Design a protein with these regions (language model features):
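A glycine- and Lys/Arg-enriched "phosphate-lid" helix/loop adjacent to the NTP-binding pocket
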Residues: 87-159
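Hydrophobic anchor at the beta1->P-loop junction of P-loop NTPases
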Residues: 5
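P-loop (Walker A) phosphate-binding loop of NTP-binding proteins
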Residues: 8
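Conserved substrate/cofactor phosphate-moiety recognition/catalytic segment
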Residues: 22-61
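Conserved lysine of the Walker
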Residues: 13
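Pre-Walker A (Motif I) flank of P-loop NTPase domains
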Residues: 1-2, 73
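Glycine-rich phosphate-binding loop used to anchor ATP phosphates in small-molecule kinases
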Residues: 49-118
């Protein structure tokens, strides 16, 4: 069984994914945040790092997705699925942070990868307001997330809805 947890930043995905994995005896696959070499740079300058950040996350999540698919003996709970990456990329493109050429490159990579993807058996969407999300981001205190704005979260929320 493959369970995906979806939602904007600060929705509670990691917490729920870990709790479900522990309860069900599944493996938890968390969003690759701590070892992301682009995260702090991205929130500091989205125009400069938007495309590279999204490509990096797309490749990392594809790698994670393949590990989930090939390990069918044990169930998996994934904190943010690869499909959600397209929401971020589209939102960044529409906001002008990723230019047309880079966005089309991203979409091309995703379309090639899509042939090798499977949908989660269950997808849980955690809906929170951008204001609640911002409060949670502030409370967890990740330095790299200090540049996140309410406007960014509102656009992201619209992309999910």
């Amino acid at each position: 069984m493959f369970i995906g947890i979806a939602g904007i930043i600060g929705a509670g995905k990691t917490t729920l994914a870990q709790q479900l994995a522990d309860y069900l005896g599944y493996e938890s696959f968390n969003e690759p945040v701590d070892d992301n070499p682009y995260l702090a740079d991205f929130y500091g300058d989205m125009n400069r790092w938007g495309a590279m950040m999204q490509l990096h996350l797309l490749f990392r999540r594809f790698e994670q997705h393949q590990r989930i698919v090939w390990n069918k003996e044990k169930g998996a709970v994934q904190d943010r699925t690869i499909y959600e990456d397209t929401i971020f990329a589209r939102m960044l493109h529409e906001a002008g942070f990723i230019d047309k050429r880079d966005y089309e490159t991203y979409v091309g990579h995703f379309n090639v990868m899509k042939r090798f993807l499977v949908y989660p058996d269950v997808l849980i969407y955690l809906r929170v307001t951008p204001e609640v999300s911002m409060q949670r981001i502030k409370e967890r205190g990740r330095d790299a997330e200090g540049g996140i704005t309410l406007d960014y979260m509102e656009k992201l929320h619209q992309g999910y809805e």
